[in-house]
Every structure is written in C-alpha cells, then in structure tokens.
Amino acid sequence: VQRGEHTVVVTPTASGKTLCYTLPVVAAAMRKQSKALYLFPTKALAQDQVAELLELNRAGNLGLRCHTFDGDTPGDARQAIRLHADLMVSNPDMLHQAILPHHTKWAQFFENLRYVVIDEVHTYRGVFGSHLANVLRRLQRVCAFYGAKPQFILCSATIGNPKAHAEALVEAPVTAITESGAPVGEKHLLLWNPPVVNPDLGLRASARSQSVRIARVAIKAALKTLVFCGSRTQVEVITKYLKEVFDRE
C-alpha cells in the first residue's frame, strides 16, 4: 500500500485487515489534503466502520472529518459532506445514483481523492459484481477528468482467486496479500462422543444435553465460548437451558 500499488488483502477474520487501509488513509489525510472513499455493500457495515473511525479520531485528536453518505443522509448535510469530508463512507448504489451523475458538485472531493477502499469484495460476484466493475470504471474516468488517480485497496474473506477477482473489478494490476501475520493462540481440537446412556438399546446422550454441559463448564472457567447449532430453534433451546442452569446456580 505504501508503494502506491493497488492491493487486495485476503486474510482471516480479526487478522487486522481494517488497519491495512485505515493507517495509510488516516496518515495521508493528516499530511495533506487527501480524501478517501470507503465502499461497503451494506449500511450496517458502513455504520460500523464510521464508528471505528470516529473513535480513532477522538482518541488521537486527529481532527479528521469522517461521514456516512447514504440514502439516510439528510439533504442539508450532503453539501457539507461534499465540501468538507476527509473520509467518506458510502455504498456502490449511492456512488452510482447520487455521486457520479453529479460529479461537478463533488469536484473538490474528486480532485483530492487518493484512496478508494472496497471491503467485502467477495460479495461482488455475478451480476452485482459486474455492476460494481462498471461503476468503478465510471469513477476512474471521473477522477481522471479532475486529475486524480486513486489507489484501490480491497479486502475480502478467504476466496480462491483474490488477485484475478480484484483485477477484474478495478481493471488494473493488483498485489494480493494472502498470508496473515496476526498472532494466533494455541488451538486444541476435541471430538466429543456422547456417552452411552442405554447399553441395551445403544442409545447415547443427546447432542443438545452434551453441548449444554460443555458450554457450562467452559463458561464457568471464564472461557469465551461459541456454540454453533444446526437451526435457530436449537440455538434458542440451548440458550434457554444455559440460562436456566446459571439462574439456578
């Protein structure tokens, strides 16, 4: 990223992908009048990113202006965002319908646009992916009109062809980062065979009762615990059992 190359980062969850683009984007915005556009496929993800950026901004007293620009953005706030946002978080639909067609109003933003961050790129496949690729072509043409050539930083969950997928979206060579350098704690894999409760009939204890038993032991040992079930009903049943167990204790 620091070399100015288009980059796609494909590493596991909680491996620090967000920092891969947040640090260079924030550093560039602080050094000079540099803008960044973040694109997320859903409003929920966009709101989460804005919350993290605002927290970082407050903690470091950075003075950066970070805003969401989506369908819920009030009309009176849109002009201020166009003129003053350093980091703008949006989605492909808004870029297509509300930003690019009115690029003359966004001239100041596009002139200084240095980074375009696209998260969750594994979701952009099929027709949706084709639409995004065309929108990005339009974005690059508009940026070229204003004398800007933004660098693309893409992030994805694990996929088989990150480099080819990213290059198809941005139509340019992309460097793929596929190895995580994040520290990983020691792991133990245990396969649990429920005990036999009726030898004559060959019946074993239910998976539900054993899941509750194991989860109870783990929680009492202050271990972070996730229990995956095959259905929502099973999740609700196990949650109910665990609540009853701990309420009694």
Q: What do these predicted regions represent?
A:
Residues 45-70, 139, 168-174, 246:
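Conserved helix-turn-beta segment of the N-terminal RecA-like "Helicase ATP-binding" lobe
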Residues 2-6, 18-32, 137-142:
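Walker A/P-loop NTP-binding motif
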Residues 10-15, 120-128, 136-165:
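Conserved helicase ATPase motor motifs in RecA-like P-loop NTPase domains
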Residues 66-78, 92-93, 180-181, 230-233:
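Conserved helicase motor
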Residues 71-114:
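Conserved helix/coil segment N-terminal to the catalytic DExD/H
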Residues 49-50, 98-103, 120-135, 238-239:
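Conserved ATPase-coupling elements of RecA-like P-loop NTPase cores
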Residues 35-49, 215-245:
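Conserved strand-helix element at the start of the C-terminal RecA-like helicase core
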Residues 151-155, 159, 163-235:
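Conserved interdomain linker/interface between the two RecA-like ATPase lobes of SF2 helicase motors
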